[in-house]
Amino acid sequence: MFGRGPSRKSDNTKFYEILGVPKTAAPEDLKKAYKKAAIKNHPDKGGDPEKFKELAQAYEVLSDPEKREIYDQYGEDALKEGMGGGGGGHDPFDIFSSFFGSGGHPFGSHSRGRRQRRGEDVVHPLKVSLEDVYLGTTKKLSLSRKALCSKCNGKGSKSGASMKCGGCQGSGMKISIRQFGPGMMQQVQHACNDCKGTGETINDRDRCPQCKGEKVVSEKKVLEVNVEKGMQHNQKITFSGQADEAPDTVTGDIVFVIQQKEHPKFKRKGEDLFVEHTISLTEALCGFQFVLTHLDKRQLLIKSKPGEVVKPDSYKAISDEGMPIYQRPFMKGKLYIHFTVEFPESLSPDQTKAIEAVLPKPTKAAISDMEIDDCEETTLHDVNIEDEMKRKAQAQREAYDDDEEDHPGGAQRVQCAQQ
């Protein structure tokens, strides 16, 4: 980022005071002072956590030659502008643990020690059919992942040894500084090129022949994914600790996310199923029966009750024929049938009379001839209301576009006229 150097020098003695060393202290003096004070103030020994954090922050800055030079010249404010937080970006426990090897603690097995970072989870979509989540199924999936090298146990070297990177002092990060003029500089923090951000290097002759010093190798892994009855869309199935492995890292999880595909016949809403069925007007008035093939291939006989009339756009429900309830597979939701009644296009006069003879008479009184004479006669025609509304909306848009072309800048002309 770009920043202007402070107009006045800010505090450049605080970090030395925290460590209890003079500004002329050599790197070895800094190490000794930090180690002694950090052990004394370590939280696992009842020390002050804030003091422990301050010690780590001070040592991180002063042990890095480039950061120390900036601090001595401009003070802590310059570090905050260019590096964010005055160089306190590393975990104080990680800095402390670098003095005591991979165990990271001098206080025995009960000490907190070096905290491992957690690897990223790997998420995969898992497409399933409605039949899959109705009946339950198992899917075998082959995946590629990174695994710790078995030959060197993830060390990267034949001897198991590594060296602290001299380019970044083991931090894994470096800072590049560019000066553009008096008081103008650019400070960029980036992964160390020498160690690729690991903070350590391996001698070429000592590199593991299997992983070539990378510490991990690619491997194929087959997972059996158990899709249980009643699982929902977007529900997750987790395989803990099966993602990519890395040294000093808690392995992340592989997560499969259920993606339920659309079904041509059934629609699912939670634990219920919906199906559309069309019947004729005769069936709606006189009764119906039909066979419905369910998701498990069972044949269900669906029929109306004697004398029952089915109204258009009505619903009927069948209990315990919906989706199995997750982890309670012997309990199911409902199956809803949405009825559409198909009316005839027209009727002959004889059919009309026959129907009038059996259907209930109209409840409203007939219109008299005198009332008819006072009315204007109209003609009804068929219409698809959705298509009609779309056509009108399109016509309005075209009319608006034509008006804009005929009168460009119309609103501006009105404003000028008002002046």
From Swiss-Prot:
Lipidation (S-farnesyl cysteine): 416
Record note on modification: Farnesylated.
SMART domains, alphabetized: DnaJ
Basic and acidic residues bias locations: 378-391
Tissues/organs with expression: Expressed in both etiolated and light-grown tissues.
Lipid biosynthesis found in the keyword field: no
Protein residues bound to Zn(2+) 1: 149, 152, 208, 211
Domain of life: Eukaryota
Gene Ontology BP term (one): response to heat
Localisation per UniProt entry: Membrane
Disulfide bond sites: none
Disordered as annotated region, ranges: 378-419
UniProt keyword list: Chaperone, Lipoprotein, Membrane, Metal-binding, Methylation, Prenylation, Repeat, Zinc, Zinc-finger
Segments passing through the bilayer: none
Cofactor remark from the record: Binds 2 Zn(2+) ions per monomer.
Membrane topology: Lipid-anchor
Zinc finger (CR-type): 136-220
Gene Ontology CC: membrane; plasmodesma; plastid
Sequence similarity: Belongs to the DnaJ family. A/I subfamily.
Role of this protein: Plays a continuous role in plant development probably in the structural organization of compartments.
Name this polypeptide is given: Chaperone protein dnaJ 2
Record organism: Arabidopsis thaliana
Taxonomic classification: Eukaryota, Viridiplantae, Streptophyta, Embryophyta, Tracheophyta
